[in-house]
Regions:
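Flexible inter-domain linker/hinge segments
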Residues: 1-16
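Short, polar loop motifs at secondary-structure junctions
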Residues: 50-54, 92-98, 231-235
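Polyanion-binding loop/helix "lid" in catalytic or ligand-binding cores
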Residues: 135, 183-234
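Acidic, Ser/Thr-rich peripheral helices and adjacent loops at domain boundaries
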Residues: 69-71, 83-86, 171-187, 248-253
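Conserved small/polar residues in nucleotide/adenosyl-binding loops
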Residues: 265-272
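Acidic/Gly/His-enriched mid-domain segments of enzyme catalytic cores or analogous surface patches
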Residues: 1, 57-148, 219
Length: 274
């Protein structure tokens, strides 16, 4: 059954002007920051990719928006979390798995990606707001945060690299079969090295390395000025300032732009359905 109301993501355009977004991606460094996120929950509007919802549920952190893009594997990441989903809003793409409508999200916000031919044709007739599709939930979250008007965007768990061979905050370990190959599920993936925020080289998957480049282009295209990455070991991403989570409040006050308390309250996660 679907009790969710469905809206266009563009309905929220610039509604969060001047506020701070925290985008939670699924990398292992997320685990270092869970307690800090909890302690500072009122400082951010939280966007979480669907893969981290189980980790957040276990830690009682309710995101304001859950961002879902995978066309196929969404169901397994959300199974059994329907009660938790009812507390959060969903941002999905027109191509996302329709199983999302059965997950009892509070509200659904639909994004129409620009590089989908069908959507392009529709948009010509319909003037739908089409957004750059990132191809991943993390990129969709970034695009959404920019369109919604956030002036600061902070990432946690955006590692795009392995930490002692751990791939995700959920604890999955990479199955390395050689210096250049690993197995993911049943697929063999090429491993490459990329520059880390520490200046060293770190191992990552070849498709992640390509995603890093895509992400850098997206940051340029979206003209994002204040994007922060709190990873302690992950890939260096051009256009993002690397700041540890603990340094964020100090960092903002020293630049004369302190955290603005979150407003636009009717969309907040902990507000219940009426």
């Amino acid at each position: 059954n679907n009790n969710s109301s469905v809206f266009k993501l563009s309905d929220l355009k610039n509604k969060f002007s001047g506020q701070t977004a925290l985008i939670i991606a699924a990398g292992p460094s997320l685990n270092e920051n869970l307690d800090k996120i909890k302690a500072n929950r009122d400082k951010f509007v939280i966007f979480a990719v669907n893969k981290v919802l189980r980790v957040l549920s276990a830690n009682e952190i309710v995101p304001d928006f859950t961002v879902c893009l995978d066309a196929s594997s969404i169901n397994s990441t959300l199974t059994g979390l329907e009660e938790f989903c009812a507390k959060t809003n969903c941002i999905m793409d027109i191509k996302s798995d329709s199983v999302l409508f059965t997950k009892n999200f509070k509200r659904m916000f639909m994004s129409f990606s620009k590089n989908d031919m069908v959507v392009k044709k529709l948009a010509d007739y319909n003037k739908l707001e089409c957004y750059e599709s990132g191809g991943t939930a993390t990129a969709l979250a970034l695009v959404a945060a920019v369109k919604l008007g956030f002036s600061k965007i902070i990432f946690t768990g955006l590692d795009m690299a392995f930490q002692n061979e751990v791939i995700y905050s959920t604890g999955e370990v990479m199955n390395k079969v050689s210096d250049t190959q690993m197995i993911v599920g049943k697929t063999q993936k090429k491993i490459v090295k990329v520059k880390s925020v520490t200046g060293d080289l770190v191992y990552t998957r070849e498709d992640y390395a390509a995603f890093i480049q895509h992400f850098e282009t997206l940051i340029k295209d979206l003209e994002c000025k204040e994007i922060y990455n709190t990873t302690s070991f992950g890939a260096a991403i051009e256009g993002m300032k690397n700041v540890s989570f603990d340094e964020l409040p100090l960092f903002f006050s020293s630049t004369g732009t302190p955290f603005i308390p979150v407003s636009y309250t009717h969309l907040r996660a902990h507000e219940t359905r009426h």
